[in-house]
């Protein structure tokens, strides 16, 4: 499978469109992060996540809460109606991951967030060609 994003498509593609590309699937788990693009996506404990089954159980909850207005502006920036990413240190490994807070700075919850931009980055750098 070959997926390629140029700058123009990146500004216009939302998560629904990315899901339709067939690159995402849901997986049970907790906090997700990218340890190393070459090694694929790993969870907060450093356990590899299947490259073809990236974690998106957060997608539905975020879609409901924010009326599916999820847009990728660049690899490290996602806008969800004023929601912001906050970076935290994973206590079990000392590695960093991100959590999603709404516009009132309220934590949305473990079941309702994920690092969408990291999954997007993984696609961009690992599935091209």
From Swiss-Prot:
Compartments in which it is found: Cytoplasm, Cytosol; Nucleus
Keyword Cytoplasm: yes
Highest taxon listed in the record's lineage: Eukaryota
Entry keywords, A to Z: Cytoplasm, Nucleus
GO cellular component labels: cytosol; nucleus
Predominant cellular place of this UniProt entry's protein: cytoplasm
Name recorded for this polypeptide: Uncharacterized protein C1348.15
Organism field: Schizosaccharomyces pombe (strain 972 / ATCC 24843)
